[in-house]
């Protein structure tokens, strides 16, 4: 298992967002140990989401003998990619750079992104993307697909976005809304959203409620 901890992220930490094979501890460990490197510096913090990017398979991996996961920035609303946030050190960052082919032509490169953890916090993190000049698709192998799918399940994250990327099925959307206060069912302003929404039930969310002002 990954070294998974529950703690506040230190401001000086290097954070990394993984969304593909690096979600899998065994796969990461095998890659490192084959090269005589220490895999222990990839410390999983927990599940996370990257907003505004769509999972795709437009990169062919010779080592995987099929398509490899990539991220494509999109202007579409309600698009995000699930994955995990990790804390890493400089040594592990160098390992990730080597694994992803940074500084090698037509391989993955670092990108700074904003990801959101399950508590709603935002974090600046490094991830790796490949800039493809063509709209192409490479079928991933079943084993590679399973690496991602099994770890999304482990992280209790949905696999809808993975299914879309593989099968070109309809793009999942965030079409649920949590409301509180006067927009709730039976309250004074609920009629403003009633015609456009179907009530599914009551729920709770972790957070703090503030009195801002009258408006």
Range-by-range predicted roles:
Residues 2-215:
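A glycine-rich, hydrophobic/aromatic-adjacent loop/helix-cap motif
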């Amino acid at each position: 298992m990954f070294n998974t901890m529950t703690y506040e992220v230190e401001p000086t930490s290097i954070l990394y967002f993984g969304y593909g094979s690096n979600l899998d501890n065994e796969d990461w460990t095998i890659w490192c140990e084959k090269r005589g490197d220490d895999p222990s510096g990839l410390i999983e913090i927990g599940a996370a989401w990257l907003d505004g990017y769509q999972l795709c398979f437009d990169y062919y991996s010779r080592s995987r003998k099929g398509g490899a996961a990539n991220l494509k920035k999109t202007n579409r609303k309600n698009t995000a990619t699930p994955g995990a946030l990790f804390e890493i050190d400089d040594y592990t960052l160098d390992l990730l750079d080597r694994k992803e082919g940074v500084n090698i032509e037509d391989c993955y490169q670092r990108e700074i992104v904003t990801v959101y953890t399950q508590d709603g916090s935002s974090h600046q993190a490094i991830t790796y993307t490949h800039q493809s000049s063509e709209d192409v698709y490479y079928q991933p192998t079943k084993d590679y697909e399973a690496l991602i799918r099994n770890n999304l399940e482990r992280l209790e994250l949905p696999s809808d976005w993975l299914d879309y990327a593989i099968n070109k099925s309809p793009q999942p959307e965030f079409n649920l809304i949590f409301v509180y206060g006067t927009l709730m069912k039976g309250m004074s302003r609920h009629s403003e959203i009633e015609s456009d929404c179907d009530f599914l039930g009551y729920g709770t969310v972790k957070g703090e409620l503030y009195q801002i002002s009258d408006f």
